[in-house]
Curated annotation (Swiss-Prot):
The lineage of its organism: Viruses, Riboviria, Orthornavirae, Duplornaviricota, Resentoviricetes. It is found in: Virion. This is Structural protein VP1. It comes from the Viruses. One of its GO terms (molecular function) is peptidase activity. It holds the Pfam family Peptidase_C97. The keyword Manganese does not apply. GO terms for cellular component: viral outer capsid. It comes from Rice ragged stunt virus (isolate Thailand). Residues 1006-1222 form the PPPDE domain. Keywords: Capsid protein, Outer capsid protein, Virion.
């Protein structure tokens, strides 16, 4: 046995150690040197017709192929070394969480299961004796932990001296002749406990022998481990005797497909004959034998397919000793049909058993000399082991992982489109200086420049004063804000993907144009000169020295008198471009030779090429999060590399405004002192395709006066945040209209009209996108491909962390995220505390009144007095449940739950019911006189209905459930309870909230609709909730009303939060091209989702980013429909969109503005079931509009009442009501757990 183990260890070490070229060379040479011996051994064991005997030379060739493809040696080593020796736990996504719990908690798939494998039928057997046997094997630490945790706690204790690390399998067989039944009792003992017991009754068989095999010790086991051999007792069958052997093997999956066989009861006898058999030579194989069973009936039955030594349910007959040897040979033949590592291990063990333990029997059969048999047996065992493992290697080389040479000659004209973000210059500076003194040459010699036009007429309006004016415009943007890395898809096939990863840079934009004429105005009749400066801002601050106040009244529209264009060769360019080709199927890094790639493409409006010829290996994470192996190189050639990609226009405005006759001025003292002014203004410059935001302009001026010479410097700087819409930076000096002639003023007016309508074209202000016209790639790649025949878990094992570590980290991250969320909730507690008190006060009193009313009948003064007393005594106590729950979110109990119970079914149930049990039960116990209530069937607990229970806010859910379920009781005792306030919630809560909005009527003229709206809603925000509730029940206000449904949910993949904002109203925007407007009929609704990317530190309000329209479930046609039905009042400030992405950006931005600008009248929480019903209600679209009896305000009032637990609105038809119930029921059946409901 020790020598056999040594051989096994030798072969495994020879194979599984990280194979270097020298080791593989030695192994190949050894196989080639033993080729003759292996051929003889194969012929001896498997017969002359066996394919193994003829494949020895091909095996050597395969090994040489391994050497030729030196990359395959790493793949083979990784594959073999990646076979785990312990059970693995697979990583499960959110959708498979139930499967995960089943795999972890359910004992049945994990505890060992045992089956009888093969039954050898033969002649009537007599005297079958009872027998016992046992098999023991060691357990790993992981297996010990699993079994100890999952074994039944009531397991019987067995007095056994074995160690805890050993599992003992016992089988006791007894034959009941009267019943013709052979009974086998199988037991499993570990850690001195009986953890498994199974009784097998085998009826109708005259059993000669049977075998047992352990299937798997854990459901995720993925390894074939070396077999352990156990001898079964001999069974006497008349004059024949057979020694059978069982192999205890661990396997991964067991086929459940049955194979046909004959029932033993129908067999009378079996005749085995040989075709052309020559018993003298001993050269017989299973192919030469035929079996002819004689049946007692025509009944065919199915016996489960067996696993183990025979791998088939072959019927074997035993007539004498020689025949049993040939039967053994038949088993060998069956083995030759095995594949992979299983075949190698079993063949090796079979050879060792045959040649070491039974060599005398073999010698007697094949007449081998006794003196050489032992050495031959040992040598044969070694060579057989090498042969089996060589087969395994050859199989891997052929079917599993192999480095291949791919000669690529790609020349694709398939076009690929990528959309890029706007590109904004990092640093731009302009200096414009003009100096004019008394007596200088006429100004007409230094004319204005206006987009190439000469304006000599300006000279007529200039005064004789001397002014030196310097205009400086600076635009500075952080490098990491714009021009970030992009990925451009160029080509994709079944095998590889070609990508470009550009990084953009900007020229140093410094452009000077001299001279730019500056003009001044001098009133000779006054003692001081007036100068006019307009920086497009509005401020009123004193100078730093306090001599003179600087005043600029209001803001005015700027218009250009000079437009400065940055030349095309001084704008955006590529700083670097990476050429990336990734393989879809490679399981190891790839390399290549003689590679060249080129892309012909448009970037913005410029077309050119980029090419690369030097590549290195890399790893790339694609958009789906999968790791790909590939090659990357920097583009070093091509016409696009140094080309200007986008012309950037910056305007310098000098003089003029739409009302040129208007005089604005800044006055300051002529005293020779220095003054400083500064101020800020908010400028918004919309640009198509950009992300909605704005920049802040800061201006400062420095003025000094010496000897009637004015030096004025104006500096404008732009400070940008994360995203901008600013497209232009300018400085402007203003000329009083009186200083210019009528002709000049008329000309400026014309130019103003022209430039006021002239905006930057989109393609000039930004790089709209990239279009790949042609992709060229050629060269040789060495790719190590995988195959579908190898489980994906093998590759995962090679490229990812241990699954158990991933699960632990996932749990830790989840706990951290939940704790962060709970801390987030702390800032809400102060806001919600009053609302919680209101709910508890109402519900507590409601329950008490209901209980007293049941005893005393109608409400009487006695009942009222008793209610007030009880209410006062229990008011403070009722808040304890919520306070405990709030504290539990961040204190030790929360951490204990997350740390010890998350991931188990028990822990999930505890956490799901934590908020509901703590809050709702606490209130209900007090309401019902300390008798725990029974929740009625059909009511829905949001904790059970919401999948994302871990990161949801349990306080809000409990609050909403209670309010919706029992809120009706408050109305029923309204005559008793004097406090009729309702719950107040804001639109920034995480759970489902319905809010009613009102806005001015768009069909009325602007002054009238604003006036009526103010009069109608005046002072409403200061009224209490009951007054607002009464206000919305009056449905004849001169306003338009709509409602929103808002809630948060958690993204399972990222753990981030997402806000859903659904708008609903009569005649509101919709994705179905339904008519809109204040008087149109039909229910319009649409939904926008936002990713919550943070919380404002000062206000606690959520900072959100729109989700792409495809992720919101819309088609392109539906997006355009929503955009067209938005209404001019919501998109009047937006430029016309060019693409569907632009339209969706306008929709998201306008939707967000709606909830900020329109007036929110009242809000209420809504339970999960009613929110689902409202979703179906909105899909009906039908509404019988009537200005007086059934208008938009009736619609929102009905929606609000239904959200608060009221009846279905009257405008909903009966068939829609029925469909609502069915839709909600189906949804609950899909997502809800009704345990305990």
């Amino acid at each position: 046995m020790e020598q056999r183990q040594y051989i096994l260890d030798l072969v495994r070490r020879e194979l599984t150690d990280t194979p270097q070229t020298q080791d593989l060379q030695k192994l190949t040479e050894r196989i080639i040197s033993l080729e003759k011996t292996i051929t003889q051994l194969g012929t001896l064991l498997l017969g002359p017709n066996s394919t193994t005997a003829h494949e020895v030379s091909s095996l050597a060739t395969a090994m040489q192929k391994v050497l030729y493809y030196n990359r395959a040696k790493a793949a083979i080593s990784d594959f073999i070394m990646a076979i785990p020796r312990y059970p693995l736990y697979s990583y499960y996504g959110n959708d498979d969480i139930d499967d995960y719990h089943l795999a972890v908690v359910n004992r049945k798939p994990i505890l060992p299961q045992f089956r009888y494998l093969g039954l050898m039928f033969g002649k009537p057997a007599t005297g079958i004796q009872p027998y016992n046997f046992e098999v023991s094997f060691n357990l790993s630490k992981v297996e010990q932990t699993l079994i100890s945790e999952l074994a039944p706690t009531e397991s019987q204790v067995i007095e056994d001296m074995r160690r805890d690390s050993t599992m003992l399998l016992k089988a006791e067989g007894r034959y009941d002749k009267s019943l013709n039944v052979f009974t086998v009792l199988i037991t499993i003992i570990t850690s001195n406990k009986l953890i498994y017991s199974q009784r097998l009754n085998i009826p109708g068989h005259r059993v000669a022998s049977f075998e047992l095999m352990i299937i798997a010790n854990a459901v995720h086991t993925t390894v074939f481990e070396p077999a352990k051999v156990t001898k079964l007792p001999s069974c006497e069958l008349g004059t024949s005797s057979i020694m059978s052997t069982t192999f205890e093997i661990r396997v991964q999956d067991m086929s459940t497909l049955p194979s046909p066989a004959f029932h033993a009861r129908t067999i009378q006898s079996i005749k085995k004959t040989w075709r052309n058999a020559d018993f003298s030579t001993g050269q017989l194989s299973a192919e030469d034998a035929t079996y002819e069973p004689k049946m007692s009936g025509a009944e065919d039955v199915v016996i489960p397919h067996v696993y183990g030594l025979a791998e088939s349910c072959e019927i074997l007959t035993i007539s004498d000793v020689y025949e049993s040897v040939y039967n053994f040979e038949s088993l060998c033949y069956c083995y030759s049909k095995k594949s992979g590592m299983e075949m190698a291990v079993r063949m090796m063990m079979l050879a060792l058993e045959l040649m070491r333990d039974d060599y005398k029997q073999v010698n007697s059969i094949y007449d081998v000399d006794h003196q050489t048999s032992e050495s031959v047996g040992i040598l044969a065992g070694i060579t057989e082991g090498l042969l089996a493992n060589a087969k395994a290697i050859a199989l891997l080389v052929k079917h599993a992982v192999l480095s291949e040479e791919l000669q690529i000659n790609l020349n694709s004209i398939e076009q690929s489109y990528s959309r890029l973000v706007p590109l904004v210059p990092i640093y731009v500076t302009f200096d414009h200086v003009g100096t004019y003194s008394k007596g200088d040459a006429p100004i007409r010699d230094e004319p204005f420049s206006l987009t190439g036009l000469q304006l000599p007429m300006f000279a007529e309006g200039l005064s004789n004063s001397t002014i030196k004016t310097k205009f400086k415009s600076t635009w500075s943007v952080e490098p990491n804000v714009f021009g970030a890395d992009h990925t451009i898809d160029c080509y994709e096939s079944d095998d590889f993907i070609v990508l470009l990863k550009p990084k953009f840079a900007y020229w140093d934009h410094r452009y000077s144009h001299q001279p730019v004429s500056a003009v001044s105005y001098s009133d000779r009749g006054k003692s001081r000169t007036s100068y006019v400066l307009d920086c497009a801002s509005s401020y009123n601050e004193e100078s730093s020295l306090g001599y003179t106040s600087l005043f600029l009244a209001g803001r005015k529209a700027a218009s250009p008198c000079a437009l400065v264009n940055i030349p095309l060769n001084r704008s955006v360019k590529f700083e670097s471009v990476s050429f990336l080709i990734t393989s879809k199927r490679s399981v190891l890094p790839i390399s290549g030779e003689n590679l060249f790639g080129e892309i012909d493409m448009y970037i913005g409006r410029v077309r050119g090429t980029l090419n690369c010829n030097k590549f290195t290996s890399t790893e790339y994470i694609d958009r789906d999060g999968y790791k790909r192996y590939g090659l990357i190189g920097k583009c070093t050639g091509g016409s696009l590399l140094n080309a200007s990609l986008s012309p950037l226009w910056v305007r310098l405005f000098c003089g003029g405004h739409k009302n040129a006759d208007q005089i604005r001025f800044i006055g300051f003292s002529r005293t020779p002192v220095v003054g400083t002014l500064s101020g800020e203004s908010l400028e918004v410059y919309p640009m198509p395709g950009s992300i909605g935001s704005s920049g802040t302009l800061s201006q400062s001026g420095r003025m000094s006066i010496y000897n009637d010479v004015t030096s004025l410097e104006v500096t404008l700087s732009v400070r940008h945040e994360a995203s901008l819409e600013t497209a232009n930076v300018y400085a402007q000096s203003e000329i009083p209209g009186a200083a210019l002639s009528t002709e000049i003023r008329d000309y400026i007016r014309q130019q103003n009209l022209y430039y006021s309508d002239l905006g930057l074209r989109e393609e000039e202000a930004m790089i709209q996108g990239a279009v790949v016209m042609r992709t060229t790639f050629r060269g040789k790649l060495y790719v190590t491909k995988g195959t579908d025949s190898i489980p994906q878990s093998v590759y995962v094992w090679n490229t990812q962390l241990n699954d158990l570590a991933v699960a632990v980290k996932m749990t830790a991250d989840l706990a951290n995220a939940a704790e962060i969320r709970s801390k987030e909730n702390q800032f809400r507690l102060n806001e919600m505390e009053q609302a919680v008190r209101e709910i508890e006060n109402q519900l507590l009193l409601s329950g008490i009144i209901d209980g007293l009313a049941a005893l005393t009948g109608p409400a009487t003064p006695v009942v009222k007095k008793a209610a007030s007393l009880v209410f006062g005594a229990m008011k403070n106590m009722s808040r304890s449940g919520f306070r405990i729950l709030a504290a539990g979110l961040t204190n030790s109990y929360f951490k204990t739950v997350m740390t010890h119970f998350l991931g188990t079914r028990k822990g999930v149930e505890v956490w799901r019911g934590l908020g509901s049990a703590c809050a709702e039960s606490s209130v209900m116990i007090k309401m019902s006189g300390k008798t725990k209530p029974i929740v009625k069937e059909g009511s829905t607990d949001l904790f059970l209905a919401d999948k994302n229970f871990i990161l949801a806010d349990p306080i809000e859910f409990a609050k909403h459930n209670i309010s919706t379920k029992y809120g009706g009781n408050v109305e029923q005792i309204g005559n008793v309870v004097s406090d009729s306030e309702r719950l107040a919630v804001g639109g920034d809560l995480g759970s489902h909230v319905v809010t009613v909005f009102h806005r001015p009527l768009s069909i009325l003229p602007e002054p009238l609709r604003t006036l009526l709206f103010k009069l109608s809603t005046s002072g409403l925000s200061k009224r209490d909730l009951s007054a607002r509730e009464a206000w919305i029940r009056q449905t004849l206000h001169p306003t338009h009303s709509y409602a929103t449904i808002s809630y948060d949910y958690v993204l399972p993949k990222t753990g981030g939060n997402r806000r859903v904002l659904c708008f609903a109203g009569v005649g509101d925007p919709n994705p179905y091209n339904l008519p809109t407007g204040d008087k149109n009929v039909g229910i319009g609704s649409y939904m926008v989702e936002f990713d919550i990317i943070g919380l404002d530190k000062d206000t606690g309000v959520k900072v959100m980013r729109p989700v792409p329209w495809k992720q919101c479930g819309y088609t392109e046609e539906q997006v355009w429909s929503i955009y067209k039905t938005l209404g001019k009042e919501y998109r009047k400030v937006e430029l016309k969109p060019y693409t569907v992405e632009d339209a969706w950006r306008v929709i998201a931005k306008s939707s967000h503005k709606r909830v900020l600008s329109d007036k929110a009248i009242i809000s209420t929480p809504i339970s999960y079931e009613r929110q689902r019903a409202i979703e179906y209600m909105l899909s009906s679209h039908g509404f019988d509009y009537n200005l007086v009896l059934n208008n938009c305000q009736d619609f929102t009032r009905g929606l609000f009442d239904y959200a608060r637990g009221g009846p279905v609105p009257d405008f909903i038809e009966n068939d829609v009501r029925i469909a609502m119930i069915h839709s909600t029921s189906r949804h609950f059946a899909e997502v809800c757990s009704w345990v305990g409901v």
